[in-house]
Amino acid sequence: MAEPDLECEQIRLKCIRKEGFFTVPPEHRLGRCRSVKEFEKLNRIGEGTYGIVYRARDTQTDEIVALKKVRMDKEKDGIPISSLREITLLLRLRHPNIVELKEVVVGNHLESIFLVMGYCEQDLASLLENMPTPFSEAQVKCIVLQVLRGLQYLHRNFIIHRDLKVSNLLMTDKGCVKTADFGLARAYGVPVKPMTPKVVTLWYRAPELLLGTTTQTTSIDMWAVGCILAELLAHRPLLPGTSEIHQIDLIVQLLGTPSENIWPGFSKLPLVGQYSLRKQPYNNLKHKFPWLSEAGLRLLHFLFMYDPKKRATAGDCLESSYFKEKPLPCEPELMPTFPHHRNKRAAPATSEGQSKRCKP
């Protein structure tokens, strides 16, 4: 069903200073925002945490952009708070490795809004599923370094992404990697306020979240970076859990059973009593990556510290000797180019697509 035309309808707003409504003059209906009519939707390229994303052309400039329609279907009183958070955060952020919010445009009837973002030709999840040969270690280092630079910028600006995963990492044809989808991101301060633990896609979720902590710091992003680095190195997800219990068990199988000795405060986490953790005394990272250098293993160990306070920061990782030894990270411009999967109409995600990356 087509949206009503603005030119044919009056828009009336409730006045908060006195009773009644007033009619918005036609020349002020869009405020300082452009209309979505000025963009030609080319194809749907995906779905973020809180909205559908299209590849589109700005008819004024001919620029190709990503147009993210903000979900309003469950809202009766305006823009969802999650979308307001994303807009507010993205307007503050300007970094080469963070997706850029160019502007906000409005739908025909002012009941829908769209975020105009910088367009990236690829996302890493699609690449991992479709590329004929895996990334080389030099290419993996190039990708992860860019993710870390973007994260260091976020964390210095007191922002936690809270949903890092390969599908939220985009890449341009020039090899520039950008972190996207800030629908779950939060600004934090001191002292850290409680937040819901039900964030971060399961495979990338830190153990403290799985065990119910409401104290979230930048360390949850760093655990996810460890999962991403391991996934790129192994060419498949490291911890593909099917439930929260299974996810915890996979972590214990890989890293050993946590205890108060290595993770002070572990026994007081809200959900510890609900799980019976297997007794597993060994860290098996070296067995998982027998070919990885000592520096690479040290970096993974640092990222997978159980104790969030001891876990590597983005700055720590950027100083890691792993990125300074051979094979050295390749330059972004030398990253391979790939067919533009995002330029095709996106098919709905299937379990078959996920299992493809899970096979040994």
From Swiss-Prot:
Residues 39-323 form the Protein kinase domain. It is linked to Al Kaissi syndrome: An autosomal recessive developmental disorder characterized by growth retardation, spine malformation, facial dysmorphisms, and developmental delay. PROSITE patterns: PROTEIN_KINASE_ATP, PROTEIN_KINASE_DOM, PROTEIN_KINASE_ST. One of its GO terms (biological process) is negative regulation of cilium assembly. Belongs to the protein kinase superfamily. CMGC Ser/Thr protein kinase family. CDC2/CDKX subfamily. It is found in: Cytoplasm, Cytoskeleton, Cilium basal body. It holds the Pfam family Pkinase. This is Cyclin-dependent kinase 10. It catalyses: L-seryl-[protein] + ATP = O-phospho-L-seryl-[protein] + ADP + H(+); L-threonyl-[protein] + ATP = O-phospho-L-threonyl-[protein] + ADP + H(+). The keyword Nucleotide-binding applies. It comes from Homo sapiens (Human). Residues 334-360 are annotated as: Disordered. Cyclin-dependent kinase that phosphorylates the transcription factor ETS2 (in vitro) and positively controls its proteasomal degradation (in cells). Involved in the regulation of actin cytoskeleton organization through the phosphorylation of actin dynamics regulators such as PKN2. Is a negative regulator of ciliogenesis through phosphorylation of PKN2 and promotion of RhoA signaling. ATP binds at residues 45-53, 68. Its main location: cytoplasm. Keywords: ATP-binding, Cell projection, Cilium biogenesis/degradation, Cytoplasm, Cytoskeleton, Kinase, Nucleotide-binding, Phosphoprotein, Serine/threonine-protein kinase, Transferase.
